[in-house]
Amino acid sequence: MKNIRNFSIIAHIDHGKSTLSDRLIQSCGGLSDREMEAQVLDSMDLERERGITIKAQSVTLNYRAKDGETYQLNFIDTPGHVDFSYEVSRSLAACEGALLVVDAGQGVEAQTLANCYTAIEMDLEVVPILNKIDLPAAEPERVAEEIEDIVGIDAIDAVRCSAKTGVGIEDVLEEIVRKIPAPEGDPNAPLQALIIDSWFDNYLGVVSLVRVKNGILRKGDKIKVMSTGQSYNVDRLGIFTPKQVDTTELKTGEVGWLVCAIKDILGAPVGDTLTSHHNPATSVLPGFKKVKPQVYAGLFPISSDDYESFRDALGKLSLNDASLFYEPENSTALGFGFRCGFLGLLHMEIIQERLEREYDLDLITTAPTVVYEVEQTNGEVIYVDSPAKLPPLNNIAEIREPIAECNMLLPQSYLGNVITLCVEKRGVQTNMVYHGNQVALTYEIPMGEVVLDFFDRLKSTSRGYASLDYGFKRFQAADMVRVDIMINGERVDALALIVHKDNAQYRGRELVEKMRELIPRQQFDIAIQAAIGNHIIARSTVKQLRKNVLAKCYGGDVSRKKKLLQKQKEGKKRMKSLGNVEVPQEAFLAILHVGKDK
């Protein structure tokens, strides 16, 4: 057991985590050179296309160190985006140490900080590593100072390596063996194993990734899931050397996967503890805090026949992604679907894309909203995650919107632009610290403004140099109103949005204009209106198409022309009272882009 090392790799987006893991696998002979490909651990097609890590992946390697001993390294590659920070905290719960990878050209960024603090809070040994030293722009000395200055860990003798060229990889491995402590645990105690992750395999049922904290997990054992109290037999277990390899037992301190024919998707929740059926442990391992979704959106299948398969797909996906929340919802415009909660817009995009790809569904998404705390006049407090659920205006005493605390790191030269952006987003500055050439800014910005397009605009105002980390802070009273969109006098529930009163007029007008371009012309006029309660704030009209009924009259009598026009008018009138308007998918997505192209 003293030769086991469990660690995660944490870093900001694009600082080279996945490439470093490739090199570690290669130098320990986990895969032959023929099987080696770039970013071997990013196994999802989506991850490869976007070049980002979404799911944490684990690998077990054997490394023969310079002191002649062979060490077993279990490591977990983690994502860097703020939307997937939950994956990171789960991975860290299974480790004793973390490699903090910092790009020697870019230096410390917001995510580096956030992930590093998470690791330090969990009492992990943090080992700094300077990556990409082969770049001409690399300044390892400056970055090492920056790590000490901003993060506050010792970094003068940080290992310098280049994952791309393979320089210094040996030193990284030696550093891991030397600095990261061996796992603690009692092999003779009752079994306790933490479920780090699980996913659904169509042949095997639920496959779980576990970390054995105490005791030994053997093939054929009868185990019990502590939260549900159900027992299962262990059919297969093993490790990833990125390939799945079967073994007969997992010892204390090891990380591996197991299959025990759980057919029910909720059978082995992530963060749960497994123990032995005959000799159960008394206490549950401390798991991870459940994350609350920050952004909600409605997802509806385009054809209602897909509803069943959509429900199953969501179930399977939520097993693999514990931060996804969903509940059934129905809309008059879109039929039956689900209200889903996500950690951020990127997360929402990824989930939608995974549903469409892996489960072959066609979906419509409604505009994302955040959760509002609403105090009603009778003193009851409710949480509203969709504009349709907002009670009528005269029943509302106060609406409180969620405020996010945003930590930004950026070069001084972009400070002005970023402050302007934050003010425009109704932000309040709470802190500003200079670290050499970098500035650490802290703002409190309404969550609704952050999730909409804050990240994209922060990146574009700072030419990609600013980095952001945000988290929910509190609810705060604000003057929010619901803007309804009416098409021919009928409210379309899927198009409603909750906005701040100051922006309502502007957002309403913009949305109405946008809808006008997207709704196809019909044989009659279509009025598109934006309303707050009964008060109309904006209107535009999609002009009717009309046939020239006078084309066949040559000169002729005016009463003849009047008769034809009158007849056409009556026809249009009848049509208008009966006709209903098809709203195309693009129109629902228009809401997403309102307020973006300023």
From Swiss-Prot:
Keyword Membrane recorded: yes
- Boundaries of each tr-type G domain copy? 2-184
Topology in the lipid bilayer: Peripheral membrane protein
> Is the keyword ATP-binding assigned to this protein?
no
This protein's UniProt keywords: Cell inner membrane, Cell membrane, GTP-binding, Hydrolase, Membrane, Nucleotide-binding, Protein biosynthesis
- Name the enzyme's class: hydrolase
The superkingdom listed in its UniProt entry is Bacteria
**One biological process term in Gene Ontology:** positive regulation of translation
Provide the protein's localization: Cell inner membrane
Checking CDD domains in the record gives: EF4_II, EF4_III, LepA, lepA_C
The record's section on InterPro entries has: EF-4, EFG_III/V, EFG_V-like, EFTu-like_2, G_TR_CS, LepA_C_sf, LepA_CTD, LepA_IV
Q: What Pfam families does the annotation carry?
A: EFG_C (PF00679), GTP_EFTU (PF00009), GTP_EFTU_D2 (PF03144), LepA_C (PF06421)
Q: What is its EC number?
A: 3.6.5.n1
Q: Where does GTP bind?
A: 14-19, 131-134
What are this entry's molecular-function GO terms?
Answer: GTP binding; GTPase activity; guanosine tetraphosphate binding; ribosome binding; translation elongation factor activity
Q: Which reaction does it catalyse?
A: GTP + H2O = GDP + phosphate + H(+)
Q: Which GO terms describe its cellular component?
A: plasma membrane
Role description? Required for accurate and efficient protein synthesis under certain stress conditions. May act as a fidelity factor of the translation reaction, by catalyzing a one-codon backward translocation of tRNAs on improperly translocated ribosomes. Back-translocation proceeds from a post-translocation (POST) complex to a pre-translocation (PRE) complex, thus giving elongation factor G a second chance to translocate the tRNAs correctly. Binds to ribosomes in a GTP-dependent manner.
Name the PANTHER family for this protein: TRANSLATION FACTOR GUF1 HOMOLOG, CHLOROPLASTIC, TRANSLATION FACTOR GUF1-RELATED
Looking up NCBIfam families in the UniProt record yields: lepA, small_GTP
Q: Which family does it belong to?
A: Belongs to the TRAFAC class translation factor GTPase superfamily. Classic translation factor GTPase family. LepA subfamily.
Tell me what this protein is called.
Answer: Elongation factor 4
